[in-house]
Design a protein with these regions (language model features):
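Sec-dependent N-terminal signal peptides
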Residues: 4-13
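Beta-propeller-forming repeat regions
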Residues: 19-389
Length: 389
């Protein structure tokens, strides 16, 4: 698993071979975080630059993009001690078109408590003050036990909802019992007021993550990853419902993201099982294991970092594997079927026990960079894309 990301990937384009070269350089912007449960990106203060947001153990923070390399990313705390337990997830997106993100967070992280709503799970919308560098006002929303993941999703009519996924159903023991209920909130005009919501019965267990399926920025549905596999839920005229379709069946899945092979061909990347050992790609009727050398794989993204017209896969794991490694790797595909991939290290000098990662163009050069948070390493690292440097 040790190869520098000085990528010289041969691509077959119209029968000709062309070389694609890129590299990443890691920069630690914070080496004193507690856990780094979840990352998000977006313009927090309306200055036109993409900032970084982090759900840490007891604080919700954002890092102001300085707009130039090697300048410090100023850290601002916008919420702290929301519950007695840890924070666990964060969602940030500009849902009202004012050029600044709205932020929701999940807290009350207590995965072993599935019966007592007062001791497990919490969802908050954070109301920003005029000065977004100060503390934001938390608005407590409905919650289920073991809240774990959330995302803002855009409906076909252009309005947004907040989708929130627990890890367990109420009363579960060892991943057995009632199925998980996904919460889908409507956004009220008065965000300090009452948030209406629907509960989507997934009939799934240990639902660790989900992937919104958006086409041209409009939501078609979500794919939910859990103990039983990956199930698709659709968002139609009558609301949310199961499609009775399984993208992955009878295999435990912890992380899921979708990507493009180009020419209107899609693939799905997963980490299997939950906190698992394997990175897997599904394309058409193919299932390809890219590596089985992970230990507690916990972060996944698909995007085109190199302008190839197809997506690459970035993944991270948080515990030392058989040869003592933790880190972040990128996989570059080279065939139209999605069966052939090459693995590369982003930057060997940047050590990270990866809890979460997310792509974003932080320097405005048109290429996606990668932000990762490290659990045992207590750091936030930006991997700067050097394709055009």
């Amino acid at each position: 698993m040790k190869r520098h990301l000085l990528i010289l990937t041969a691509l077959l384009i119209a029968g000709k071979t062309s070389a694609q070269t890129a590299t990443f350089i890691g920069e630690s912007i914070d080496d004193k975080i507690s856990i780094g449960y979840g990352l998000a990106t977006g313009d927090v203060d309306g200055d036109g630059k993409t900032d970084i947001l982090l759900a840490d153990k007891k604080e919700i923070v954002w890092y102001k993009n300085p707009g130039k390399k090697e300048a410090s990313w100023t850290r601002y705390v916008i919420a702290k001690d929301l519950t007695e337990q840890d924070n666990v997830c964060i969602a940030a997106r500009d849902i009202d078109g004012d050029g600044k993100v709205e932020v929701a967070v999940g807290a009350g992280w207590n995965p072993s408590e599935t019966k007592n709503l007062k001791q497990s799970g919490a969802v908050f919308y954070l109301v920003p003050p005029q000065d977004r560098m100060q503390l934001w006002e938390p608005v407590k929303l409905h919650h289920e036990v073991t809240i774990h993941r959330m995302q803002w999703v855009k409906r076909a009519d252009g309005t947004f909802q907040l989708a929130v996924l627990p890890l367990h159903g109420e009363g579960n023991v060892g991943g057995e019992g009632a199925g998980v209920k996904m919460i889908v909130f409507d956004v009220p005009e008065d965000k300090k007021g009452i948030w209406g919501y629907d509960l989507l019965e997934t009939n799934m267990h240990m639902t660790h993550n989900f992937q919104p399926m958006e086409v041209s920025g409009k939501l078609l549905g979500v794919s939910v990853a859990g103990k039983e596999g990956v199930q698709v839920f659709m968002n139609g005229a009558d609301g949310w419902a199961t499609s009775n379709q399984w993208m992955v069946a009878d295999k435990g899945v912890g992380e899921i993201r979708s990507g493009s092979l180009g020419k209107n061909q899609l693939f799905t990347a997963t980490i299997e099982p939950m906190h698992g050992t394997s990175l897997v790609v599904y394309s058409k009727d193919n299932r390809t294991v890219l590596t089985d050398k992970l230990k507690e794989g916990h972060a996944l993204a698909c995007a085109d970092f190199f302008g190839q017209g197809r997506d690459q896969i970035v993944m991270g794991w948080r515990n030392p594997n058989a040869i003592g490694e933790t880190g972040v790797r990128i996989f570059v595909g080279s065939d139209p079927e999605g069966k052939k991939w090459q693995e590369y290290v982003l930057d060997e000098k940047s050590k990270i026990a990866c809890e979460d990662l997310i792509p974003a163009d932080l320097d405005g050069d048109g290429d996606l960079d990668i932000i990762a948070s490290g659990r045992a390493t207590h750091n936030v690292v930006v991997y700067w894309n050097q394709r055009k440097k």
